[in-house]
A protein has these predicted regions:
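N-terminal catalytic or cofactor-binding beta/alpha core of small enzyme domains
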Residues: 1-89, 94-162
Length: 163
């Protein structure tokens, strides 16, 4: 890892609660198959639970896992920005490249999402996209099927030094 870089990692599985989803549970991709704050199906559309969590259980998980994770992330972003004048959040996770339930075709290796350029400075978007596009043996796309999850959209505020 680069000197001065820090990490904030979720220590819970995304099936418990998905840290990349909005706390309200609203869909980032209305009209498309997706999973929620507490996923009820896997990426093949198959049920995850014998008995689905009710609203009270979902709220308990939100408070126990989602909220503390995002409080830690917000605090770290503020600390880094206060120290350096800028903070860059690189929100990354893995996913299968072929999931017919969620999308047609095969995903590129790198799926860079900046919510159509609203969550980071143009220079950061261009540099990241160029590096990924030029990585030997890998494919990349900018703002394709995944345009940036809730974390990217919520914290990406370039005018405030948060990218």
């Amino acid at each position: 890892m680069l000197r001065g870089a820090t990490t904030v990692r979720a220590t819970f599985h995304r099936s418990v609660v998905d840290a990349y989803r909005p706390p309200s549970g609203e869909s980032l991709y209305p009209g498309q198959n997706t999973t929620g704050l507490v996923p009820l199906t896997d990426f093949d559309g198959e049920p995850l639970w014998l008995s689905e969590p009710d609203a009270a259980e979902i709220d308990r998980r939100r408070q126990a896992f989602h909220a503390p994770y995002h409080a830690a992330l917000a605090a770290e972003l503020d600390r880094v920005r206060d120290l350096h004048g800028i903070a860059i959040l690189y929100d990354c996770h893995s996913i299968r490249s072929h999931i017919p339930y969620l999308f047609e075709g095969t995903l590129p290796d790198f799926n860079i999402g900046t919510n159509l350029g609203t969550t980071c400075a143009p220079e950061i978007e261009a540099t990241t996209s160029e590096i990924c596009a030029n990585a030997d043996g890998y494919t990349a796309i900018l703002n394709g099927r995944f345009k940036g999850g809730w974390t990217t959209r919520h914290y990406g505020r370039p005018a405030e030094g948060l990218h």
